[in-house]
């Protein structure tokens, strides 16, 4: 049985098609009934993942093909979710690197591939989308080889098999000129090149928990790969946590994977990836083992957080109107629940009972958490993301990121100038000969906060930007990436009126239209100059009975700017907050009245 088992992780950059590839592998292996209605993008299970087209949580699926059982674990591509990636690598024996036949390998793939090499895994490279116009598979293979060399791959890892595929059409082949009619070459490559798990079948049971799931019916579900021995329902086991404390428990159900379903099994053997219920409170990296042989496996390491922000109770005048959960206790309970499976997250209580400091791997990591909370009915206010400085050998250090930008040549100058002002160092410049340039930078993380939206405007939406955490290094002196413009602040509470907004359009760009509810201290637009301006957007037109009301010109408003959560977080300054509720995202000053703001500006800065 063990010789027929294969465990493999899939690595791919956002939008290179790994989720579609898994769909097709499932359909063609007969794991899904071909007549059954197949759901698209099966691996991206939560709404946020489907909307953004990114994978956040690592997920498992299993395929049966010609008596072989292939466990496939999907990995998140973003370094922000590096905590997930670490754990996946401890469960598999090889990685499937999916690369777009036009784009080539991207920095996010680099991050995950580096982790895979550190675990000594050998890759299989899948060049996907070979049918797309402009595909250049040979160039991509060279790029992948160069990437592997840069990551210090061993000779064995550099001798990798290549499979060409078009996941959308469900075909693969060993040569991009000569494709088979289905995915068989890819299944064959997995079976031939992935080693069977190197495990001890006869020893006492031992496994490490590398993922957690929660189900209100059975409680916490621990997922991991059995290192040695066998496990069956109702077996007595001992659990060792990361501090070495032990406790006894009884296994409830043992669930294996088939397709996307979890199916109950009576016996699971070493090498297989299973889910176990009934073990009570579990943590990532706990070891579950036989009661007679209590041996802990080495703990899984997870990268430290690099960005933090404050989650505060919503104190605006509209507090409680739109959300169900608004108190500090509810917010803290929700954050503690998130800590159970989100291992790269840290939550600290502050002196202020209504504010919590939440640290994570990056802006994306934290904004995904905020978006999830908002959908669950929470109301909260969040501050601007700040990077976490460290003291190393008496020197203050800050995080740096590798950034890859792909821009049209006409925008190259302005982008390079902007990154120069944000203290970025150009490492590599690579024109593709077709009017686009790829730029590689190393830049302090704080220089990137707020840069994405500016970059999109600069390149008229045609630029691509990817970043991954690189390392900690000495702090560069000076401020980075401060907002140039001031803001327009409402001076009262009520409904915004078109007549008043029309008069404000010359002052800057507005965030809201006619009829929107506003309150004092809410930011309603960007000022065209660098200072903040308190304005009145509530006054209607004075009507007299001297004139017919129809003779005046119609008021025409420019459509307002609608900000997403990420854009709002990038936009705000240190004295501002983003108010997040289930139905709206508003930006406000930390001090709502003008008197309070003046008083705060006079107070000495304690930074």
From Swiss-Prot:
It is an enzyme of class 3 (hydrolase). It comes from Escherichia coli (strain K12). Residues 386-482 are annotated as: Domain V. This is Large ribosomal subunit assembly factor BipA. Disruption phenotype: Decreased extracellular K5 polysaccharide production at 37 degrees Celsius, increased extracellular K5 polysaccharide production at 20 degrees Celsius. Cold-sensitive growth (20 degrees Celsius); cells have a long lag phase and double more slowly. Decreased capsule synthesis. Cold sensitive growth and decreased capsule synthesis are suppressed by an rluC deletion. Residues 3-198 form the tr-type G domain. Residues 483-607 are annotated as: C-terminal domain (CTD), binds A-site tRNA. Residues 203-320 are annotated as: Domain II (or beta barrel domain). GO terms for biological process: response to cold; response to heat; ribosomal large subunit assembly; translation. It is found in: Cytoplasm. It catalyses: GTP + H2O = GDP + phosphate + H(+). Induction: Induced about 2-fold at 18 degrees Celsius (at protein level). Basally expressed at 37 degrees Celsius, 3.5-fold induced after shift to 20 degrees Celsius, maximal expression is seen at 2 hours (at protein level). No increase in expression when cells are grown at 43 degrees Celsius or when engineered to produce increased levels of the stress second messenger ppGpp. Expression at low temperatures is activated by CRP. It holds the Pfam family EFG_C. Residues 303-385 are annotated as: Domain III. PANTHER family: TR-TYPE G DOMAIN-CONTAINING PROTEIN (PTHR42908:SF8), TRANSLATION ELONGATION FACTOR-RELATED (PTHR42908). The gene is bipA. Very poorly to not phosphorylated on tyrosine. Phosphorylation in vitro is strongly activated by proteins present in pathogenic strain E2348/69 / EPEC / MAR001 but not non-pathogenic strain K12 / DH5 alpha. Phosphorylation in vitro increases GTPase activity.
């Amino acid at each position: 049985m063990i010789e027929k088992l294969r465990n493999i992780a899939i690595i791919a950059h956002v939008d290179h098609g790994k989720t579609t590839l898994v769909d097709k592998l499932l359909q063609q292996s007969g794991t899904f009934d071909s007549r059954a209605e197949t759901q698209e993008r099966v691996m991206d299970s939560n709404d946020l993942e489907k909307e953004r087209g990114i994978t956040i949580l690592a997920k498992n699926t299993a395929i049966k093909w010609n008596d072989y059982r292939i466990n496939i674990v999907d990995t998140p591509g973003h370094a922000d979710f590096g905590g997930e990636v670490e754990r996946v690598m401890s469960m598999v024996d090889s990685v499937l690197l999916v690369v777009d036949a036009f784009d080539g390998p991207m920095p996010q793939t680099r991050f995950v591939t580096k982790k895979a090499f550190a675990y000594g895994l050998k890759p299989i490279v899948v060049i996907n989308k070979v049918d797309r116009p402009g595909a250049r598979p040979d160039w991509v293979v060279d790029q992948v080889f160069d990437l592997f060399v840069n990551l210090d791959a061993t000779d064995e890892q550099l001798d990798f098999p290549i499979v060409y595929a078009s996941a959308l059409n469900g075909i693969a082949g060993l040569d991009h000129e000569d494709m088979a009619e289905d995915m068989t070459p890819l299944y064959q490559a997995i079976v031939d090149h992935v080693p069977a798990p190197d495990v001890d079948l006869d020893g006492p049971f031992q496994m490490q928990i590398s993922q957690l799931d929660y189900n209100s019916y059975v409680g916490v579900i621990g997922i991991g790969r059995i290192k040695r021995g066998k496990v069956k329902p109702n077996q007595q086991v001992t659990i060792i946590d990361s501090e070495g404390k032990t406790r006894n428990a009884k296994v409830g159900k043992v669930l294996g994977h088939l397709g996307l379903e979890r199916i109950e099994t009576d016996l699971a053997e070493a090498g297989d990836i299973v889910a176990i219920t009934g073990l009570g409170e579990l943590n990532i990296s706990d070891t579950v083992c036989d009661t007679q042989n209590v041996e802990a496996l080495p703990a899984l390491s997870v990268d430290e957080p690099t960005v933090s922000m404050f989650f505060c109770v919503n104190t605006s005048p509209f507090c409680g109107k739109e959300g169900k959960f608004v108190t500090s206790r509810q917010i803290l309970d929700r954050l503690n629940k998130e800590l159970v499976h989100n291992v790269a997250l840290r939550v600290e209580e502050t002196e202020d009972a209504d504010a919590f400091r939440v640290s994570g791997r990056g802006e994306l990591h934290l904004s995904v958490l905020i978006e999830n909370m908002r959908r669950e009915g929470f109301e909260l206010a969040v501050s601007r993301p700040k990077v976490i400085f460290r003291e190393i050998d008496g020197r203050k250090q800050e995080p740096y990121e590798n950034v890859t930008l792909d821009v049209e040549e006409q925008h190259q100058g302005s982008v390079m100038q902007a990154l120069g002002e944000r203290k970025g160092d150009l490492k590599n410049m690579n024109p593709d000969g077709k009017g686009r340039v790829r730029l590689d930078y190393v830049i302090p993380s704080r220089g990137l906060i707020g840069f994405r939206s500016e970059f999109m405007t600069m390149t008229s939406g045609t630029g691509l930007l990817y970043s991954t955490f690189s390392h900690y290094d000495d702090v560069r002196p000076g401020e980075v990436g401060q907002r140039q413009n001031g803001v327009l602040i409402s001076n009262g509470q009520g409904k915004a009126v078109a007549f008043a907004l029309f008069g404000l359009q010359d002052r800057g760009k507005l965030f809201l239209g006619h009829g929107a509810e506003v309150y004092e201290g809410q930011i309603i637009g960007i000022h065209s100059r660098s200072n903040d301006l308190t304005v009145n957007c509530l006054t209607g037109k004075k009507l007299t009975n001297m004139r017919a009301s129809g003779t005046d010109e119609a008021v025409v408003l420019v459509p307002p700017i609608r900000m997403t959560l990420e854009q709002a977080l990038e936009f705000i300054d240190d004295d501002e907050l983003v108010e997040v509720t289930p139905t709206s995202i508003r930006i406000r000053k930390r001090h709502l009245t003008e008197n309070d703001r003046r008083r705060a500006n006079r107070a000495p800065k304690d930074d």
